[in-house]
């Protein structure tokens, strides 16, 4: 079983595209794309993690 992860090393970014590729975070919130998710991960000081790809 491989752990799902997202590489957020190039974030945070000042602006995200409107591309819709939903990611479900460990906070049970659906993020619109990797950029939005990674920005939130950075803001949470790493406490937010990936639950799964797709809507929560």
Curated annotation (Swiss-Prot):
Residues bearing attached sugar chains per UniProt: 45
Swiss-Prot/TrEMBL domain comment: Avian ovomucoid consists of three homologous, tandem Kazal family inhibitory domains.
Site (Reactive bond 3): 18-19
PANTHER family, A to Z: OVOMUCOID-LIKE-RELATED, SERINE PEPTIDASE INHIBITOR, KAZAL TYPE 2, TANDEM DUPLICATE 1-RELATED
Keyword Kinase carried by entry: no
Keywords per UniProt: Disulfide bond, Glycoprotein, Protease inhibitor, Repeat, Secreted, Serine protease inhibitor
Protein name, entry field: Ovomucoid
Residue ranges of every copy of the Kazal-like domain listed in the record: 6-56
GO MF entries: serine-type endopeptidase inhibitor activity
Naturally occurring in which organism (per UniProt): Cyrtonyx montezumae (Montezuma quail)
